[in-house]
Amino acid sequence: MARLPIYHRVLLGWADAGRQTVSSEELAGACGVSPAKLRKDLSYLGSYGTRGVGYDVRFLAYQISRELGLTEPRGVVIVGAGNLGQALVAYRGFASRGFAIVGLLDIHPDTVGQRFGAPETPITVGPMSDLEPIVADGRAQIGVIATPAEAAQQVCDRMVAAGLRSVLNFAPAVLHVPEGVEVRKVDLAVELQILAFHEQRRAEEHHQTMEHASLGKAINA
């Protein structure tokens, strides 16, 4: 499941470029997985491709869209109109992926009423009191938290109380939710720390290799 969105993004890019077919080897390479793993993933969709031809790009993208629940637009409400919230509403890729930003909310009176996003489709920041009506009338199915850490749990609680069951959390905070609520956390600092760890490991391994090589030369001298 975690790899399907990656396949979907790559396929949509190729479809937009007019590409019609792709082999499992090409798609796997573009997505950073092995061809065997790709074929296994896609077999669960009932898609095996055509020998000698490969996969139909648009049809495979549609199959994955259906599996991910993207054949119908999903409404997204963002709480937090700071730099991150503004960047999210300005991103043009959501619509092509089946997501519509239906609200950008903030607690600060001086921010409410401002307009952000793409010039052709700007979004006006609303007050937090708009959250419940947006969820109640079915406009939003997913909530995004783009607030400071200290406000994240309270915002999450309010989203859940309003009826949202899917939350994407950008705040550097661990959220506690009742059973049946799915929270996905995006912590850029943690991801950078993981990369730094692997970079450090590579540097240490390289240093050890150089030491062994130097020792070998000394012994053979």
Role assignments for model-derived ranges:
Residues M1-I6:
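Short, Lys/Arg-enriched anionic-surface-contact patches
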Residues R9-R19, S23-A162, P178-L192, A196-A203, ...:
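Hydrophobic, well-ordered beta-alpha structural blocks that scaffold small-molecule cofactor pockets
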Residues T147, F170-P172:
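Short secondary-structure boundary segments
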Residues E204-H212:
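Intrinsically disordered or compositionally simple regulatory linkers and C-terminal tails
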